[in-house]
Swiss-Prot record:
Matches recorded under PANTHER family: RHOMBOID PROTEASE
Keywords: Membrane, Transmembrane, Transmembrane helix
Name of protein: Uncharacterized protein C13E7.11
MF annotations from Gene Ontology: serine-type endopeptidase activity
Family annotation (InterPro entries): Peptidase_S54_rhomboid_dom, Rhomboid-like_sf, Rhomboid_protease_S54
Gene3D superfamilies: Rhomboid-like (1.20.1540.10)
Transmembrane spans: 32-52, 74-94, 109-129, 133-153, 157-177, 188-208, 214-234, 247-267
Record-linked Pfam families: Rhomboid
A cellular component annotation (GO) from this entry: mitochondrion
Main location: membrane
Topology versus the membrane: Multi-pass membrane protein
Amino acid sequence: MNRLNFQSLLWKFGQKRFYYRPWIRIENIKPTPLWKPITFAVGVGSATFYTANYLDKRRKNYPKSSYGFPIPQTSSRSLVLSIIGINVGVFALWRAPRFSHLNRFLQKYAVMNPIFINMPSMIVSAFSHQSGWHLLFNMVAFYSFAPAIVDVFGNNQFVAFYISSILFSNVASLLHHRLRFGTKVTPGSLGASGAIYAIAAATSYFFPNASVSIIFLPFIPIKIGVALLGLMAFDAWGLISRGFSSFANFTLIDHAAHLGGGIFGWLYAKYGYSTYNRSTRPRPPSLSKPFFSRSVSF
């Protein structure tokens, strides 16, 4: 999750050109209260898990459709490639000319503004990348970790987990911004990094012996848990040192979203996964048919 220039904010005031100001305080417009994005995140996250739970129950209790055919399910590879395709598609849309109607639309819905929060942008921004390198790094990491977690969770649960991790990481980013900077305008955020941290954290829980290679040290395998802790320690340092360290200020990385995603992924893997599976267990055979369909003899 990276910070982005707040071009969309200036458009709210009818600006025709873009001028960068590192800190601006808006006095006449009230920022979006935090209870709105929090309520949105809880509501949408709950709805996605409820829908996934319903679909998984239906698949387990009724493995065949009413016509006798198995209920189709997309393969894990197809699901992962579909999500990557959405990210690539949004990246292609960003190639539109600056200040065009399409670019303005993306600035409004594909970038999460920390002050004037557009609720759909809390989800869409996680599929949005402006930089080719940002997209490449995130999608390589996503393709490396996601297939294993899709196989563990199943397609429906993974989609609910992925959307919820996006929302949780963005809420963490918003909370940090309001607590740290108040109503000061900072660059908006976009990118899938927060959700990828959640997937990596879940992978480290289910596959603790798995090893990864860091791009700068490709020939040195590192336990995934150690690598994840190292990255989260770096994010914690960046969170604390922003404003004091020139490097932390220069990177414009949304460290709070990374930490929020990692924490959500680990907590869900430890507690949420087992709870979800208990709720989708198939019903006993004796209860799978309505009472009036059973044969009764006297």
